């Protein structure tokens, strides 16, 4: 019974205000596989009568936003394009050689006025990431986003109007690697003044890759052969966001914390397993925490670790995210509790989403299309100042 039912495939659609151009995409998330990136493959449907001889172009833009775009300071906008590509879709300049199954079925369904396009990502672009603003700065966005735009114009020199264009936000994302690296483990010793033997610390994780929402356990062993007393042991998950634009800035934030007040006396050993759960839900009020890019007003999560292709410079513009476990020992000083000091070690790890089940990939059998409109209201706050002016003029 259920086997006779066709599966349903969501197609994302958006139409220009003048109804002359519509864009259809089979997905909104495009996966960076490290060695390659899924191209943006879509279809543009045109109404030649409404176009009145105009051409239709499609652009792919990666932009870094770092402020409130409503404010224009002496002609400077708070946006920098990291990548821009443009192709002419109508009239077609060249045929798309290899159509995807979704493109083939869309063109068959839409008819003769449907034209396919393919836009490729270069391998050096960052993924979709944003920094969490303060509660009072909700409109001051800072992050990397990607946009597909289609517009009609007589020629590229002419300024097109908002009503003649379609804008769709998409995401570039990564999933956890298939082959994780070695299990993180750190061993270190400290030699203190007036102590013949050192304080030894061993910390390890169960694996290198953890998924969002998964509990992280940290096994800690303290062998105290010194004359000092370890008063406290703490563990934390540290997120480091390397924001590279005009300079390279680092933002390190603690996103999970656990500690033990168990004292480790001289000439003794202590073992303990700490539990950490890095979640955005516990960090809603912390400013400048890196988050995965989001579409519309849906919820998101802490940013995933950034994986770079071998040979790619880490100074590429964007936001690069790393995670580490920090284990800190608070040790008594010469005057006891009055002059305590801290020593620590670190364990890098990867925090990402698991790769979806391969069974969720495009099926060989035909699927029913379900068309979902890109909501224009959700993008209204993303417009640049000059585009908002055009929109207001168009609505008059």
Swiss-Prot record:
Which pairs are disulfide-linked? none
Q: Which GO terms describe its molecular function?
A: G protein-coupled receptor binding
Q: Which GO terms describe its biological process?
A: G protein-coupled receptor internalization; signal transduction; visual perception
Q: Which positions carry the signal peptide feature in this UniProt record?
A: none
Q: Which InterPro entries match?
A: Arrestin, Arrestin-like_C, Arrestin-like_N, Arrestin_C-like, Arrestin_CS, Arrestin_N, Ig_E-set
Task: Provide the alphabetized UniProt keywords.
Answer: Calcium, Sensory transduction, Vision
Q: Which domain of life is it from?
A: Eukaryota
- Which PROSITE patterns does its entry note? ARRESTINS
Q: Which Pfam families match?
A: Arrestin_C, Arrestin_N
Spans through the membrane? none
Its GO CC terms are: photoreceptor inner segment; photoreceptor outer segment
| Keyword DNA damage among record annotations | no
Q: Name residues in a coiled coil.
A: none
Q: What else is known?
A: Arrestin binds calcium.
The family note in this entry says: Belongs to the arrestin family.
Q: Which PANTHER family match?
A: ARRESTIN (PTHR11792), S-ARRESTIN (PTHR11792:SF15)
Task performed by this protein:
Arrestin is one of the major proteins of the ros (retinal rod outer segments); it binds to photoactivated-phosphorylated rhodopsin, thereby apparently preventing the transducin-mediated activation of phosphodiesterase.
Identification of the protein by name: S-arrestin
């Amino acid at each position: 019974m259920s086997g006779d039912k066709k599966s349903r495939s969501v197609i994302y659609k958006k139409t220009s205000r003048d109804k002359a151009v519509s864009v259809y995409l089979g997905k909104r998330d495009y996966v960076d596989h490290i060695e390659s990136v899924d191209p943006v493959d879509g279809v543009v449907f045109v109404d030649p009568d409404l176009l009145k001889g105009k051409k239709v172009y499609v652009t792919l833009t990666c932009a870094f936003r770092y402020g409130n775009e409503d404010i224009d300071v002496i002609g400077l906008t708070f946006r920098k394009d990291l990548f821009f590509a443009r192709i002419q879709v109508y009239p077609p300049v060249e045929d798309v050689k290899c159509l995807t199954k979704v493109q083939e079925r869309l063109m068959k369904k839409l008819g003769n006025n449907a034209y396919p396009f393919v836009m490729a990502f270069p391998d050096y672009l960052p993924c979709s990431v944003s920094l969490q603003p303060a509660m009072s700065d909700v409109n001051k966005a800072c992050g990397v986003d990607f946009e597909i735009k289609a517009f009609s114009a007589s020629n590229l020199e002419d300024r097109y109007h908002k009503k003649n264009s379609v804008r769709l936000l998409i995401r570039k994302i990564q999933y956890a690697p298939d082959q994780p690296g070695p299990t993180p483990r750190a061993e270190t010793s400290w030699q203190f003044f007036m102590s013949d033997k050192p304080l030894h610390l061993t910390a390890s994780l169960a694996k290198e890759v953890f998924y969002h929402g998964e509990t992280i356990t940290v096994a800690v062993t303290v062998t105290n052969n010194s004359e000092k007393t370890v008063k406290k042991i703490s563990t934390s998950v540290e997120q480091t966001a390397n924001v590279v634009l005009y300079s390279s800035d680092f933002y390190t934030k603690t996103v999970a914390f656990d500690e033990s007040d168990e004292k480790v006396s001289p000439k003794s050993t202590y073992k303990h397993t700490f539990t950490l759960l890095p979640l955005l839900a516990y960090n809603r009020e912390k400013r400048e925490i890196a988050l995965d890019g989001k579409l519309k007003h849906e919820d998101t999560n802490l940013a995933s670790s950034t994986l770079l292709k071998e040979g790619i410079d880490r100074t590429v513009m964007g936001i690069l995210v790393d995670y580490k476990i920090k284990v800190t020992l608070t040790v008594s000083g010469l005057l006891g509790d009055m002059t305590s000091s801290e020593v620590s070690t670190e364990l890098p790890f990867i925090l990402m989403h698991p790769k979806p089940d391969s069974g969720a990939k495009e099926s060989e059998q035909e699927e029913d299309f379900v068309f979902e409109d890109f909501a224009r209201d959700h993008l209204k706050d993303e417009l640049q100042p000059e585009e908002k002016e055009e929109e207001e003029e168009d609505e008059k």
